[in-house]
């Protein structure tokens, strides 16, 4: 298979003409035989387990099931590359062509595309300037529509007629003294196709522009909506009747595979069942038309074909949902594309990337703001290439294979090397949805046990994260440039202000506020050890740790530094000893000075909780 490389700027989704759908699947063999049309509902032969010819897995249409081997087995080597077998018509090539070669089903009667009929808004109803309910009645054979009123005064173009009304008019037309002529009515997708073909887009657009100038309110809005749809058709070069399908594309077989299970049974994609329904009904309709079956039977088969194509394109959009085994709804083409688990969001936009991981977040209260706790199990996987490089560089192993063996054995030397590797190597944490630039920030990793990522509580508002089961993704910047940018621009400690408002986004909340309140609160009921004197702050904390005093007990602690407690205006109690030492007692302070007024000592009344709170802040400021 030749390597194809074609650059493009964007992918455009639009309407395809019947000719283009044919081109996707049609190929001409060297013997001038044209292949591409899928005519049989069979998939594989139950005895030979080979794909049936002209079926949904046909090798002539989609390519060989085995590399360099035709269906009948006449050609079986790479040396026969490009030859088309004279007996079976299969091209000798790689089997991977079955991932991109398409086929098509030629319908015995046209059907409407359910997206354009039942979408919101309905483009078909908007273009025809008819209520959606009326268009549905025509499509699903519940009402006739007048395509040409002829010379009948009682009829008008696009008027709906019931079965009884049409029979009555038919009787009048075929009566001997009838003056009626030129009347034409239709039903089903064929009638809708005819109505769409009658629309002259450019003329209609001009008329609408004139009408919009004179219209007001709701009518004007409706005209603008219709003009916008018509302008889009003109702009894209699409024709209105392409919304009615006469050819259906069949996607490549390897994208809807059939695989054999252990017990000899087969598991197959739901699409194969949906395609099979379409082919069966299409073949039955063609046979009924061939034998000139009664109109009512043909019409019923056309309606069933319409419903089968609707289910293939978007199962459940209209009517009863088609279900398979265990009453499970079959997954249609739309279901594969749309939603969070669809092809776009899951596989194209949300690809898994190398050097990334994902885990639940838990609070890391002992971390600094620019740090995150990275599980060892995750870190060794993310930084494996760096660890291997360092192991070889230090001469601990000779090659990559030996290094990987060492890592798999969880050798203790690995963790020392990993510590060296991650030092100064930031990682980026991202929490979906990333609604602003602070949804992804850089942190210095700290190795932790367990399997959860530890996060500093202060950065939670930026990520809009909480610890009730939220997950975050880790990404490793690889190049030196990426690492330096992460450290300088994305480090959490450099993103304190919100880029949207300019206000601080790093604000303590919940546990931090509660903890700060609890440490510094008054609690008259917990006063064990109250009134004791301590020589310094550390002594008071030590006494609390040894359970000599309660966290909220008021104690006296020596502190010779400046104190601002708002008590300078309060008149203290003054005692003077025989040696001239003056003791001044305030409600929260006791100061001793010698006869010259020099400070001997100062004791402040506080709690161990407040000492811990103050010491934590002072230590942070000092570092």
UniProtKB/Swiss-Prot annotation:
* Chain residues that bind Mg(2+): 466, 468, 470
| Listed GO CC annotations | DNA-directed RNA polymerase complex
Cofactor annotation comment:
Binds 1 Mg(2+) ion per subunit. Binds 1 Zn(2+) ion per subunit.
The UniProt entry, under InterPro entries, shows: DNA-dir_RpoC1_gamma, DNA-dir_RpoC_beta_prime, RNA_pol_asu, RNA_pol_N, RNA_pol_Rpb1_1, RNA_pol_Rpb1_3, RNA_pol_Rpb1_3_sf, RNA_pol_Rpb1_clamp_domain
Q: What positions does the entry give for Zn(2+) binding? A: 70, 72, 85, 88
Q: Which GO terms describe its molecular function?
A: DNA binding; DNA-directed RNA polymerase activity; magnesium ion binding; zinc ion binding
EC number(s) recorded for this UniProt protein: 2.7.7.6
Give the record's GO biological process terms.
DNA-templated transcription
EC class, as a word, reads transferase
- Superkingdom assignment: Bacteria
Identify which cofactors the protein needs according to its UniProt entry: Mg(2+); Zn(2+)
Family annotation (Pfam families):
RNA_pol_Rpb1_1, RNA_pol_Rpb1_2, RNA_pol_Rpb1_3
Q: Does Transferase show up as a keyword for this record? A: yes
Q: Which reaction does it catalyse?
A: RNA(n) + a ribonucleoside 5'-triphosphate = RNA(n+1) + diphosphate
Query: What UniProt keywords are attached to this protein's entry?
Result: DNA-directed RNA polymerase, Magnesium, Metal-binding, Nucleotidyltransferase, Transcription, Transferase, Zinc
In which family does this protein belong, per the annotation?
Answer: Belongs to the RNA polymerase beta' chain family. RpoC1 subfamily.
* Role played: DNA-dependent RNA polymerase catalyzes the transcription of DNA into RNA using the four ribonucleoside triphosphates as substrates.
Q: How does it assemble?
A: In cyanobacteria the RNAP catalytic core is composed of 2 alpha, 1 beta, 1 beta', 1 gamma and 1 omega subunit. When a sigma factor is associated with the core the holoenzyme is formed, which can initiate transcription.
Specify the protein name: DNA-directed RNA polymerase subunit gamma
